[in-house]
């Protein structure tokens, strides 16, 4: 059984700040808890939630945390890798020194090895941690909710709601503080009832892009997923990045891939405008990669 340090000890260690939101002990709290699947603790950020959990696992410098991602590329967010590396080693392969398994559901797309990794974690009696920062209320093809297989799950509130900060640690044990954060309490209370609409609009905008560029899409059609980006495979990434000022692009994984954020609060006409630009560019240059 993994035990989380009491708040007083965490404060003494200067580890992080966490909040017990008394003022959302109501329908919003219960609804959020039902979606996440267990009681939860709210932190100042998702990274702070990771720090609190890794600190509690009491790993040594020779211990390793296996990090595995949906895309299985070399890229891992420094929010995860650098945070864990402050306490122990990180690895992309399973070894005799593996003391925890950390699954990253890239951009809300489910890791395909959930069940296998659960079995490995159980066999080794080590914790399985799911990073659902981009995958709130996403499900895999088997109807399994992301965050429900692991012993612990991590969420990032700004990636769920249009708010400034906040993270969630959910699991078998949780921290409660005598402190409260009224901003987070108010924001969660306001936005939790709108979760269904947020998910619906994000998926709708994703599907707008997918219908036009399914052949070039890095990821599959979203059915039960709640995708945070649309991935496009193209050799003309430099030109495409320059042609639409209203959408922020990123290239952090593979040089010929771009990721277009799927914003639940953006009008569909913005994505329709982007699609027109992409289609015009593809027709004129004929160099969108053919799969």
Where are these regions (language model features)?
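PLP-dependent aminotransferase-like
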Residues: 27-34, 39, 44-123, 127-137
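Short, solvent-exposed loop/turn segments at secondary-structure junctions
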Residues: 47-49, 71-73, 106-109, 134-136, ...
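Generic structural signal for small/hydrophobic residues in well-ordered secondary structure
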Residues: 49, 65, 105, 131, ...
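Conserved PLP-binding active-site segment in aminotransferase class I/II-type PLP enzymes
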Residues: 1-45, 52, 56-60, 96, ...
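Conserved PLP-binding active-site segment of the aspartate aminotransferase-like
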Residues: 231-235, 250-277
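Glycine-centered flexible beta-alpha turn that most often forms the glycine-rich phosphate-binding loop
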Residues: 131, 240-244
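Active-site PLP attachment segment
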Residues: 148-179
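Conserved glycine-rich beta-strand-loop-beta hairpin in the small C-terminal domain of fold type I
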Residues: 5, 9-19, 189-192, 199, ...
